Amino acid sequence: MSYAKAISKYIRISPRKARLAAGLIRGLSVSDASLQLTFSGLKGGRLLKKTLDSAVANAETQLDMRRENLKVVEVRVDAGPTLKRAKPKNRGGRHPIMKRTSHFTVIVSNL
C-alpha cells in the first residue's frame, strides 16, 4: 500500500492544543478532513490544514493518486523544542513562560 507523507516542524502552537485538531480528522477522507479543519475554529486546525494539503499534493504529484480516493491514515503531533522566557515579578523574582512548539506529521493513502 503506497502512501504520501508531509511533515511540518517547529510550528508555534502547544502540542496539547494541536492534538485537539488532530483528533478531528483521524481516519476521515481527505475532503471531509479538509472541511472539518476549515470550520473547526481552532488555530491548530488552520495550521494542520496546511500540512494536510501538502500531503495531498505529494500524493498527487509523486504517486499519481487522485484526491477523491485519499484517506487520512495517520496524524501525529509531537512536541518540538520549547523556548524558555521569563516574566519579571516583584522582589527580583521571575515566572517562567514556556513557548512550546510542535511537529506535525500527516500520512494519506488510498481508500
From Swiss-Prot:
PANTHER family in the cross-refs = CHLOROPLAST 50S RIBOSOMAL PROTEIN L22-RELATED, LARGE RIBOSOMAL SUBUNIT PROTEIN UL22M
Q: Which gene encodes it?
A: rplV
A biological-process GO annotation: translation
Q: Which UniProt keywords apply?
A: Ribonucleoprotein, Ribosomal protein, RNA-binding, rRNA-binding
Q: Which GO terms describe its cellular component?
A: cytosolic large ribosomal subunit
Protein name per UniProt: Large ribosomal subunit protein uL22
| The family this protein is said to belong to | Belongs to the universal ribosomal protein uL22 family.
Q: Which superkingdom?
A: Bacteria
Q: What does this protein do?
A: This protein binds specifically to 23S rRNA; its binding is stimulated by other ribosomal proteins, e.g. L4, L17, and L20. It is important during the early stages of 50S assembly. It makes multiple contacts with different domains of the 23S rRNA in the assembled 50S subunit and ribosome.
Q: Which NCBIfam families match?
A: rplV_bact
- Species this chain originates from: Protochlamydia amoebophila (strain UWE25)
Subunit structure, per the record?
Part of the 50S ribosomal subunit.
Entry-linked CDD domains: Ribosomal_L22 (cd00336)
Cite the GO molecular-function annotations of the record: rRNA binding; structural constituent of ribosome
Question: Per its UniProt record, what InterPro entries does this chain match?
Answer: Ribosomal_uL22 (IPR001063), Ribosomal_uL22_bac/chlpt-type (IPR005727), Ribosomal_uL22_bac/org-type (IPR047867), Ribosomal_uL22_sf (IPR036394)
